[in-house]
Each structure stands twice: as structure tokens, then as C-alpha cells.
């Protein structure tokens, strides 16, 4: 059975008007359409506004059969009583770093409006710049 990367590792920083946001809650969620599996994990930013989340992987014999991989990915930031969409993306492969074809490094500025940014196969929507 091959390793299937549903969500690559993520690193990032969160700021508001250039000031690091310490103690922000970062929640990552996924929906793997092939198995209708959902999952989530959470971390909190440090004093410098930094956070990291490890990759999420699975193994499956079913993945050896022809199908279109689709994993809905979201990252939400909760800070100061407000929720921000940091990352909304539909991953269409099981590759490590397959979202951007490079490691996911986010620079999230809470004072900005969420916008779409080009990614490997589609757009990533959110308040974070892709490093």
C-alpha cells in the first residue's frame, strides 16, 4: 500500500498590521471524498505568530484503482473573537507537497480580505500569501 498524502505539512506566520498574533487558534480540516473521511487538527501560534502542522497521510488498497483524488482542505484562524479563512483548496493528487509543488509556507495577514491565489491545479482561497 502506498502512502497517500491528504494534506501536506504546513508552516506559517500570522500577523495583524505587521504585529505577530500570539495565541491564535489554527484549525486544519479535510474531507477525503474517496472514503468520505473527515479529520481535523489544531495548533496555537507562538509569541512570534508562528505555527506548524504535520502532514496528514493514509494508506489504502482502494487508491490503487482508477479514480480522481479529491481532498477538500481548509485552514481556519481564530483570533480576537473573529474567524478567518486562511486556506480553502481542493487537492487532486496524493503527492507530498502536491498542493503547490513546493512546501506550504503561509504568511497570513489578518487585516486583508480573502482572495484566490494560483496553486498547482486550481486556486487557494484565503487571507494567506503563499511563500
Tell where the protein language model's regions lie, with residue ranges.
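Short amphipathic beta-strand segments in non-cytosolic proteins
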Residues: 25-42
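Residue-level signal for short segments within beta-strands and strand-turn junctions
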Residues: 16, 28-32, 79
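Feature of secretome-associated and extracellular-like proteins
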Residues: 2-4, 35, 63-131
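Structural motif
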Residues: 13-21
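A short acidic/small-residue loop/turn micro-motif
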Residues: 22-23, 28-29, 58-60
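Structural beta-strand segments of beta-rich domains
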Residues: 8-10
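Glycine-centered loop-to-beta-strand initiation motif
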Residues: 39-59
Amino acid at each position: 500500500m502506498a502512502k497517500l498524502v491528504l494534506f501536506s505539512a504546513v508552516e506559517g506566520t500570522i500577523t495583524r498590521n505587521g504585529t505577530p498574533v500570539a495565541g491564535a487558534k489554527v484549525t486544519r480540516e479535510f474531507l477525503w471524498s474517496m472514503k468520505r473521511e473527515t479529520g481535523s487538527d489544531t495548533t496555537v501560534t507562538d509569541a512570534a505568530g508562528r505555527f506548524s502542522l504535520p502532514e496528514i497521510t493514509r494508506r489504502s488498497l482502494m487508491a490503487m484503482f482508477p479514480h480522481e483524488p479529491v481532498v477538500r482542505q481548509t485552514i481556519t484562524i481564530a483570533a480576537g473573537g473573529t474567524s478567518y479563512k486562511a486556506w480553502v483548496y481542493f487537492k487532486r493528487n496524493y503527492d507530498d507537497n502536491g498542493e503547490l509543488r513546493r512546501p506550504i509556507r503561509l504568511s497570513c495577514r489578518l487585516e486583508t480580505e480573502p482572495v484566490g491565489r494560483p496553486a498547482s491545479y486550481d486556486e487557494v482561497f484565503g487571507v494567506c500569501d503563499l511563500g
